[in-house]
Amino acid sequence: MARQKKYSGKGGARKKNKQKQNVAPRRRVEFKYKGFSLEELQEMPIKKFMEIVPSRQRRTMARGITPKQRKLVMKIKKARRLTNRGKDARVIRTHCRDFVITPEMIGLTFGIYNGKEFKEIKLVEETVGRFLGEMAPTRGVVQHGSPGMGATRGSMFVPIK
């Protein structure tokens, strides 16, 4: 049986680079949420917006808002007024993780509490219809270091320097 030559991968990279030179830059596709553009969503009344979001969010919005959420709505309106005047809106800090992101919140920066700190998130079009809590995870990936002295049975007999 004859051995096949292993592919080094160098030739393919050159071909890809040539192809990239000939291709025109990609145009950004206009954002649509369930068939509606961002401008249409922002003009839409909240009752109509509730009809197009998923059932979990629709149920949360139908229950009404708590006093803490009402305070957040007031902060959003104040920040929106500042941005309309041309001033830079500050970060809106909140503990309300169960608040549904509405189209009027797009473009604002939120400090969402994750149980330890406020994660600063600038809301973009793709976040419409999600919860604020989805943007700031409460659990991070743990990367452990090497075990300490006496942590394992094998390290009992290793001389300490």
Curated annotation (Swiss-Prot):
Residue numbers spanned by region Disordered: 1-26
Ranges of biased composition (kind: Basic residues): 1-19
Presence of the UniProt keyword RNA-binding in the record: yes
Any one GO BP annotation for this protein: translation
Top-level division of the source organism's lineage: Archaea
Keyword RNA-binding appears in the UniProt entry: yes
Gene Ontology cellular-component annotations: cytosolic small ribosomal subunit
InterPro entries per record: Ribosomal_uS19, Ribosomal_uS19_CS, Ribosomal_uS19_euk/arc, Ribosomal_uS19_SF
Keywords, in A-Z order: Ribonucleoprotein, Ribosomal protein, RNA-binding, rRNA-binding
GO MF term set: rRNA binding; structural constituent of ribosome
Function comment: Protein S19 forms a complex with S13 that binds strongly to the 16S ribosomal RNA.
Similarity comment text for this entry: Belongs to the universal ribosomal protein uS19 family.
Protein known as: Small ribosomal subunit protein uS19
Organism placement in taxonomy: Archaea, Methanobacteriati, Methanobacteriota, Methanomada group, Methanococci
Gene: rps19
